[in-house]
Amino acid sequence: MGARPSRRQMTEARRLALTKLPPELLVQVLSHVPPRALVTRCRPVCRAWRDLVDGPSIWLLQLARDRSAEGRALYALAQRCPADADADADADGNRHDEFPFCALARFCLRAPFGRNLIHNSCGEQGFRGWEVEHGGNGWAVEKNLTLVPGAPSQTCFVTSFEWCSKRQLVDLVKEGVWQELLDSGQIEICIADWWGARENCGCIYRLRVRLLDEYENEVVKFSASPNPVLQWTERSCRQVSHVFTNFGKGIRYVSFEQYGRDTRSWVGHYGALVTHSSVRVRIRLS
């Protein structure tokens, strides 16, 4: 009796069998492979497979399987996506990605819809991802005083007795939203922020969110300046939210900026508490 083929030999045999398929059938087969596996396992097989993964056909088939209202609307827009969209280039046209994926591949890999595009929204990683300016005794990270619903971590950033600010710049194209989709007029950008105060000290909180073009010029702005929280007011969390819609063409970045301080000028960290900041992108159905 002959020796049983090894697992590696069996894998090679299956791979050879697939490579013999006509391109139109191979595209159908590969469209059932998860996006990350397509890139890491299928793309290196051969030049033909690489070209298929780098092109739009497989990714369009994956998007077509979502039959929800949002999925159908997205698929209609995806069919008009340029096949050679320069999905990860800066304003000077320089690329910053190791693979020459089409824009649809990047979208499926990074899945920007529905997820929070703000990184480290609750301070669970310290100040990573944020540009920080410290006033007074500076920013600190502490445990939440009250439960914040839906937060990935029950921690928050805390301000001091002088103005503290921090900012995060979200590159929507780098996160997976191709430029033509942003320019389609059917995209909404939803922002939200949670803030509050200590019971024994009042605070002041400000939020500014700006939509910027590829050169980081401001196009649209939203600002929130709630009334200061007074000392000995009931301790609670408050939410600020806004939806950008019909913002025109050319948007690439979201600049998310927070400001806070206390009202008593106490040494330490008695100012506004901020957490669970979010930027989300979705299809506008109406």
Curated annotation (Swiss-Prot):
InterPro entries: F-box-assoc_dom, F-box-like_dom_sf, F-box_dom, F-box_only, Galactose-bd-like_sf. SMART domains: FBA, FBOX. Expressed primarily in the brain. Keywords: Ubl conjugation pathway. SUPFAM superfamilies: F-box domain (SSF81383), Galactose-binding domain-like (SSF49785). Residues 107-283 form the FBA domain. One of its GO terms (cellular component) is SCF ubiquitin ligase complex. Residues 15-62 form the F-box domain. Part of a SCF (SKP1-cullin-F-box) protein ligase complex. Interacts with SKP1 and CUL1. Substrate-recognition component of the SCF (SKP1-CUL1-F-box protein)-type E3 ubiquitin ligase complex. Able to recognize and bind denatured glycoproteins, which are modified with complex-type oligosaccharides. Also recognizes sulfated glycans. Does not bind high-mannose glycoproteins. This is F-box only protein 17. It comes from Mus musculus (Mouse). The gene is Fbxo17.
